[in-house]
């Protein structure tokens, strides 16, 4: 019998993506880890919270998080 290797989920991506009930992928915004003082208040406010993954990236990300 041939042993099939299980595909593993990308562990780095698992920590950064949340899946909703309707299978949408939520991610955090980029550009907010440091240097916030040089950005405007509006920029910092708009970078808070989460946003949905774009459709062009959805299929690529979905293959990386198979097990979830």
UniProtKB/Swiss-Prot annotation:
Which molecular function GO terms apply here? structural constituent of ribosome
Gene Ontology process terms (BP)? translation
Could you name the Gene Ontology cellular component terms for this entry?
Answer: cytosolic large ribosomal subunit
Name of the protein: Large ribosomal subunit protein bL35
Q: What domain of life?
A: Bacteria
Family matches, as InterPro entries: Ribosomal_bL35, Ribosomal_bL35-like, Ribosomal_bL35_CS, Ribosomal_bL35_sf
Which Pfam families does this one have?
Answer: Ribosomal_L35p
């Amino acid at each position: 019998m041939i042993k099939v290797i299980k595909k593993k989920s990308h562990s780095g991506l698992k920590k950064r993506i949340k899946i909703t009930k309707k299978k949408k992928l939520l991610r955090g915004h980029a550009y907010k880890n440091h240097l916030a003082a040089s950005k405007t208040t509006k920029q910092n406010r708009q970078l808070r919270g989460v946003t949905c993954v774009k459709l062009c990236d959805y299929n690529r990300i979905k293959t990386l998080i198979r097990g979830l």
